[in-house]
A protein has these predicted regions:
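Solvent-exposed, non-transmembrane regions of integral membrane proteins
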Residues: 1-137
Length: 137
């Protein structure tokens, strides 16, 4: 677990950008395009849903982060979207709109997240085995 957490801390990165619809930025090996933003309504909230297109050579995918406003409490939440890959996860969130019309966009690349979870599961199974063994001794 220590190795996976150390690798995650050493390799992960985070950047914040100010973007308008149509803007493109480079983040590590990815090119990210802010394709569009749209208003969507649900039964108990309305959301601003953004569409970001990630491209890296042959690999192209889209992520859709949201800002939601719930009708009952008037509460505003930020819903991130995550691209899950075997070695790394890419998180994207959309923040507030600035006075110049641009949006704050936060990008994170986290490595070896699944390895951290697998390590925790192995440790838990080890603890269960130790407890079971003591009961039957």
């Amino acid at each position: 677990m220590i190795i996976s957490i150390s690798l995650n801390a050493a390799l992960s990165s985070e950047r914040t950008f100010s973007m308008s619809v149509g803007d493109e930025v480079k983040f590590n090996e990815n090119t990210i395009e802010f394709a569009k933003i749209s208003l969507q309504k649900s039964s108990n909230f309305e959301s601003l849903s953004a569409d970001f297109i990630f491209s890296n050579g042959d690999d192209t995918f889209e992520l859709y982060p949201e800002k939601r406003k719930y009708f009952v409490r008037g509460e505003i939440t930020t819903e991130s979207d995550i691209s899950i890959k075997p070695i790394k996860d890419i998180y994207i969130t959309i923040g507030e709109q600035q006075s110049n019309g641009k949006w704050i966009v936060n990008l994170q690349e986290n490595y070896f997240v699944r390895l951290i979870w697998i390590s925790a599961i192995i440790m838990s199974l080890g603890a269960v085995l130790v407890i079971r063994r003591r009961i039957y001794v």
